[in-house]
UniProtKB/Swiss-Prot annotation:
Residues binding ATP: V18, G60, C61, G62, K63, T64, E65, D250, E315, R387
Gene Ontology biological process: protein unfolding; proteolysis involved in protein catabolic process
Gene name linked to the record: hslU
InterPro entries reported for this sequence: AAA+_ATPase, ATP-dep_Clp_protease_ClpX, ATPase_AAA_core, ATPase_dyneun-rel_AAA, Clp_ATPase_C, HslU, P-loop_NTPase
Name of the protein described by the UniProt record: ATP-dependent protease ATPase subunit HslU
Biological source species: Methylobacterium nodulans (strain LMG 21967 / CNCM I-2342 / ORS 2060)
């Protein structure tokens, strides 16, 4: 779990997301409150419930990007799901309890990686010994093994093929499939590899010819897992999920039953009803054991273009007490998105063209023109926020991207006149599109 202060979390989000200070503050405080609760002792710690968040804002203003960056910051089990993927219990499709099962899988993966890092040195030695056995045989003299070990560590044997027995190779290619609507202990998914593992010798494995370079990763995984207690990993992961798990529920506005609209749209409100106990706190059965959701933090977000937050069930609104509105982006915001963010679109474009030997530079007035065109098209057609910049920039760079392999060594300067010339047709099409039914 992260120990960053709210100010540090906001500062980290500022590197990638322009504006939206209220939303950043809300998620930073919520994340810090996870740490604060861990410092409490006794019954009070159990009583402190997370304050779930509802983020409201137009598409392309940074809601989903906040969740992506938060996932990297959280250092805790984090799951981002779209509310539209789920259906009411009893209908074909995934029920909302699958959210918790998926979160547990994420938690186990995190905990396993953490434990593997703690035994990395021992696993490295064991993997190296197995590769040496495959190269020179287990009966080789110590001098021979030392000689080959030096060459192995120097990378001289990376391309040499060896025959190794890797666990699970017999069933590695077998898929998982879901059983729609299968509730409770069956967990809705069957892994054919697990089912047929013993029958096909999946645990024993079978000899495979593989290069030394490619053998390192699977051997490290195998040797690490031999040193780990899987039951302990599962118990610790479930505890981590229950105490520090975070679920980001995107597109929550799409499951609103819109006012005055009836008909066969039964699963929308049903999904909301199914979410109620999950967000309030319930126990979900997973294949690893029961998981309590009382202290899992839920962050819901939606554009609410067609529906309104008040169209959500009142009970669901009550379970999302912190409401944050994200502002639409302005010309200045677009300009900052293009220039200030850590991996801005302009930096990406320049780096991509540099791989072809073409040096692309954007003048300040070109950046202003790109921002202005994006805002104009958003206002005249459909406001899709910062995503519009990708459309505009691709149109501007279209000719350069196509001819880049033939223009290696050139320096291309893009100014406002070039931008206007390239996007003129885009603006005209936007104007015409208003009159087409």
């Amino acid at each position: 779990m992260t120990t960053f202060s709210p100010r540090e979390i906001v500062s980290e989000l500022d590197r990638y997301i322009v504006g939206q200070a209220d939303a950043k503050r809300a998620v930073a405080i919520a994340l810090r409150n996870r740490w604060r609760r861990q410092q409490l002792q006794g019954p009070l710690r159990e009583e402190v419930a997370p304050k779930n968040i509802l983020m409201i804002g137009p598409t392309g203003c940074g809601k989903t990007e906040i969740s992506r960056r938060l996932a990297r910051l959280a250092n805790a089990p984090f799951l981002k799901v779209e509310a539209t993927k789920f259906t009411e219990v009893g209908y074909v499709g995934r029920d909302v309890e699958q959210i918790v099962r998926d979160l547990v899988e994420v938690g186990i993966g995190l905990k396993r990686d953490e434990k593997r890092r703690s035994v990395q040195a021992k696993a490295e030695a064991a993997a190296e010994a197995r590769i040496l056995d495959a190269l020179v045989g287990p009966t080789a003299s110590q001098a021979t093994r030392d000689s080959f070990r030096r060459r192995l560590r120097a990378g001289e044997l990376d391309d040499k093929e060896v025959e190794l027995e890797l666990a699970g190779s017999a069933t590695a290619g077998l898929p998982m499939f879901e059983i729609p609507g299968m509730p409770g202990a069956a967990m809705g998914a069957i892994n054919l590899g697990d089912m047929l593992g013993k029958a096909l010798g999946g645990q024993r494995g079978r000899p495979r010819r593989i290069t030394v370079r490619d053998a390192h990763a699977p051997l490290m995984t195998e040797e690490s897992d031999k040193l780990l207690d899987q039951d302990t990993i599962i118990q610790e992961a479930i505890r981590e999920v229950e105490d520090n798990g975070i679920v980001f529920l995107d597109e929550v506005d799409k499951i609103c039953a819109r006012e005055g609209r009836g008909g066969a749209d039964v699963s929308r409100e049903g999904v909301q009803r199914d979410l109620l106990p999950l967000i309030e706190g319930t126990t979900v059965a997973t294949k690893y054991g029961p998981v309590k959701t009382d202290h899992i933090l839920f962050i819901a977000s939606g554009a609410f273009h067609v529906s309104k937050p008040s169209d959500l069930l009142p009970e669901l609104q009550g379970r999302l007490p912190i409401r944050v509105e994200l502002a639409p982006l302005t010309v200045d915001d677009f300009r900052r998105i293009l220039t200030e963010t850590e991996a801005s679109l302009l930096k990406q474009a320049v780096a991509l063209m540099a791989t072809e030997g073409v040096t692309v530079t954007f003048t300040d007035d070109a950046v202003d023109a790109l921002a202005r065109v994006a805002v104009d098209v958003n206002s005249s057609v459909e406001n899709i926020g910062a995503r519009r910049l990708q459309t505009v920039l691709e149109r501007v760079l279209d000719e350069i991207s196509f001819a880049a392999p033939d223009r290696s060594g050139e320096i291309v300067t893009i100014d406002a006149a070039y931008v206007r010339e390239r996007v003129e047709s885009l603006a005209q099409n936007a104007d015409l599109s208003r009159f087409i039914l």
